[in-house]
């Protein structure tokens, strides 16, 4: 893998891959130091009428409050949205299959990308960097860091959510990770030796 990280967030009409539609996708690419490269993209997608009609009320309320619902009629197609995101990603990630998908609880996003934007999804490495995993570990191992983490606006717009995820990982990197350059090789080998599982 190279040092690039592809941050993607999706907004949907719900969480069901069989019934719900992708309505917004945003992407930012960072380097390994979490510096954002370029302007990123944020695209509203016009969903099928059926997906709007069956949208759960809690989701409708959320997308109304964020202003996203009002923008859907002027949204673009899935194919056009994918082309725009892929063009931005390719500008900063030259080789396919090298950069991981990053974000918060990105397993759900990856499912919708695999269904609706397969060229984009397969351009990414199969690994993911999920900030929610770091957060769950911090809650268990470093509760003070967890409970003092940066507040989120919670406006449920894709690009804002990505920016918050990047800021959150920056925070956890500083608050709970070993400062760079980390342990020397001998120390790392000593620690590793303590965690080698016995042969079966």
UniProtKB/Swiss-Prot annotation:
Any idea which GO molecular function terms this record carries?
A: 3'-5'-RNA exonuclease activity; nucleic acid binding
Q: Which cysteines are joined by disulfide bonds?
A: none
Q: Where is the Exonuclease domain?
A: 5-169
What are its E.C. numbers?
3.1.15.-
Q: Which InterPro entries match?
A: Exonuclease_RNaseT/DNA_pol3 (IPR013520), Oligoribonuclease (IPR022894), RNaseH-like_sf (IPR012337), RNaseH_sf (IPR036397)
Q: What is its main location?
A: cytoplasm
The task this protein performs is described as: 3'-to-5' exoribonuclease specific for small oligoribonucleotides.
Protein name (record) = Oligoribonuclease
